[in-house]
Amino acid sequence: MDSQLSENLLKCVNETYRGAMLVRNGLPIATAGDVNAEEQRVICEWNSNAVSEVLHLHDSNTKILIATKESCVLGLIYRNT
């Protein structure tokens, strides 16, 4: 596993998993669990060249671990309870 992705996974340890979303070309392919409109927007608009990144939503306890592979974006949503 990519070391950056491993480090970013560790940032989400002890957080409550809420849902996931798979996106291609800015359009959702699949959604699971609890994903709100703001989280969906962030994942769909993410276009970084980084392998992975943990995003903290403004004024929220939500973390989104985003990873890219083969032009797809996977967003895993966690909440600090």
Curated annotation (Swiss-Prot):
Coiled coil: none annotated. GO terms for biological process: regulation of TORC1 signaling. One of its GO terms (cellular component) is Ragulator complex. This is Uncharacterized protein C23D3.16.
